[in-house]
Amino acid sequence: MATLGVNIDHIANVRQARKTVEPDPVQFAFLAELGGADSITVHLREDRRHIQDRDLFLLKETIKTKLNLEMAATEEMLEIAKKILPDYVTLVPEKREEVTTEGGLDLKSNVQYLKKAVGNLQDSNIEVSAFIDPLGEQINYSKEIGFDFIELHTGKYAKLSGSDQYKELQRIIESTYLANDLGLVVNAGHGLNYNNVKKIASINNMNELNIGHSIVARALAIGLEKSVREMKSLITSN
């Protein structure tokens, strides 16, 4: 049965829109855990557009579940991760001009650098995941580089409908099975919401789904704890 990682970046987005102290994403992480979140996900971007360094340090000290740090594989971020020691790190591509992460890592073009970065984190007892598109080549490179996990990018699945969405779902399923055969743990995320999550959650051996925007959007109407509970129920009711 898949677990639920709640991404709280969008709480920090609201705070940073006014450069003030509220809403505090650390407080909302607590509410997400009350609602059933199995882990808390944050993306510390190089431009610090939402999550700040203080958020990371406080989350590490206060949350009761697990902390998943999304970050680019830069020297600065590697050093921060080794100071904070999150439960796991998810390496993601990052472009300053993007609104949100637009696609998976291109592992093929960065094999040697990523091997070094992954080994560096693992030497500090941090498990490492690669955020990748559901492609066999990327999964094989994930194994070669030495990642513990992969997170399959579900953004294309989320945007499609009908037979096109079904085809993308099959690609995600096949990617999950390939990764499992290689000994990789499989997570998934990006664009998942209350209408499309169940088919992804029902994939055999899907480990965790990382979801943020749809939960926070619904929380504006019904509150964060309840919105997390509803999503958790959809994931676990298969």
Swiss-Prot record:
Subcellular localization:
Cytoplasm
What keywords sit in the KW lines? Cytoplasm, Pyridoxine biosynthesis, Transferase
Q: Which GO terms describe its cellular component?
A: cytosol
GO terms in the biological process aspect are: pyridoxine biosynthetic process
Marked site positions, Transition state stabilizer: E151
Task: Give residues annotated as binding 1-deoxy-D-xylulose 5-phosphate.
Answer: D9, H10, R45, H50, T100
EC no. given is 2.6.99.2
| Associated pathway | Cofactor biosynthesis; pyridoxine 5'-phosphate biosynthesis; pyridoxine 5'-phosphate from D-erythrose 4-phosphate: step 5/5
Q: Does the keyword Transferase apply?
A: yes
What's the main place this protein lives? cytoplasm
Which PANTHER family does the UniProt entry name for this protein? PYRIDOXINE 5'-PHOSPHATE SYNTHASE
Q: What does this protein do?
A: Catalyzes the complicated ring closure reaction between the two acyclic compounds 1-deoxy-D-xylulose-5-phosphate (DXP) and 3-amino-2-oxopropyl phosphate (1-amino-acetone-3-phosphate or AAP) to form pyridoxine 5'-phosphate (PNP) and inorganic phosphate.
Which protein is depicted?
Answer: Pyridoxine 5'-phosphate synthase
Which species does the entry assign this protein to?
A: Prochlorococcus marinus (strain MIT 9215)
Q: What is the lineage of its organism?
A: Bacteria, Bacillati, Cyanobacteriota, Cyanophyceae, Synechococcales
